[in-house]
Amino acid sequence: MNADRPCCQFVTTKPTVENVTPFAQFQLTQPRLKGVSLQQLSALPILYGGGRNFLFGRFTDSEPQLQDTDLFVLDSCILLWPAHALRGLRIPYDAVIYHAVRRADVLELVLAVERDATLDSLFPPAPGPQPFALSTLELRLRPRYATYDRHYSGAVEQLFTFRDFGLNRGDAMVANCNTAIATCMEFHHRAAAADDDDDDDDGPAAHVTPLAELLAPAGHVPIYANHGSADDLTDDGLTDDGPQGGAAAGMALAFCSAARVPTKRRRQD
């Protein structure tokens, strides 16, 4: 396990219509500013996708133990919240190894996450040495209801509405969630790459190399004091302790006019 990356955590605040903003609503209500990311413009977490009534578990050879779970794909993390639970599982995007859509009996979402202490408490690893250096846990999310199944819920849906997420049931819900995870992981990796570039820019501006010593050996006093600002072509850049009586380097410029001189043309008989 990489000690530098964020780990999975348990959270006690469930996303609702009051503490998150669906991405479609955010686009309608917030102006876009050039050079400013969406995360900096929104005061609330942005909900890119998710859905209700997922069967959540892991791939096993025996009959899997699945439970009804809500999935929230936020701009900052992936959140799994089992039904009737008082806490949810927060998965940072840095911990996601891969995600995909798999066709089994029905379409299901596959999520491979790097193991840590939190995941080990929920899904204990197999005893014995691990065959790979990177220990991962493969989870699956399968919709309980198909796209056109009729079922009744005791609560009115206010977050995953048709206006913001379209037809978000069955296979369509799996595809929507997979696309939302891909979108969020893309700008997370892009932001991490930009941070790495900023760290590279903070490095030294000049490096001493053997080539520099070859061009300017020790004890050599240059005639021109070049500071890298194109000041080596002026007389002010000449040092006073240069060679006396020698040929001074210089530059001669000649400007010629291309205009023709008018002449009188003699007509021959």
Curated annotation (Swiss-Prot):
What does the sequence similarity comment in the record state about its family? Belongs to the LOT5 family.
Give its localization.
Answer: Cytoplasm; Nucleus
Q: Which UniProt keywords apply?
A: Cytoplasm, Nucleus
Q: Which domain of life is it from?
A: Eukaryota
* Ranges in coiled-coil conformation: none
Q: What is this protein called?
A: Protein LOT5
* Entry's Gene Ontology cellular component terms: cytosol; pICln-Sm protein complex; spliceosomal complex
Q: Which GO terms describe its biological process?
A: mRNA cis splicing, via spliceosome; spliceosomal snRNP assembly
Which InterPro entries does the UniProt record give? ICln/Lot5/Saf5
Major place of residence: cytoplasm
Spell out where the chain crosses the membrane: none
